[in-house]
């Protein structure tokens, strides 16, 4: 399992569009991918579920952890984190 911590940087947080982008990217990988809200010390949720991600209420500045476990875990974490760090183009 590979994990990386980072912050949500886009002004509007992970609302419907960025959550959907994250899910589409996560679904390209065979590995199980999760996202966890570190500020509220919540359990990790499935990064392949828009509903689960949006339910976390991830706003700008929220510390999160992206993790993946499986055959392509390294690439999954790298690409998912790059997407979050890009601010989803916002």
Regions found by a protein language model. Give the residues of each.
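Intrinsic-disorder/low-complexity, polar/charged segments enriched in Ser/Thr/Lys/Arg/Asp/Glu/Gln
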Residues: 1-5, 63
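Charge-rich, low-complexity amphipathic helices
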Residues: 1, 44-48, 75-76, 80
């Amino acid at each position: 399992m590979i994990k990386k911590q980072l912050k949500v940087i886009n002004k509007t947080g992970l609302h419907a569009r960025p959550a959907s982008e994250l899910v589409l990217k996560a679904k390209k990988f065979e590995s199980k991918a999760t996202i966890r809200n570190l500020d509220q010390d919540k359990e990790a949720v499935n990064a392949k579920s828009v509903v689960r991600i949006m339910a976390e209420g991830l706003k700008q500045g929220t510390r999160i952890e992206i993790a993946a476990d499986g055959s392509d875990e390294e690439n999954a974490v790298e690409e998912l984190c790059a997407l979050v760090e890009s601010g989803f183009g916002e």
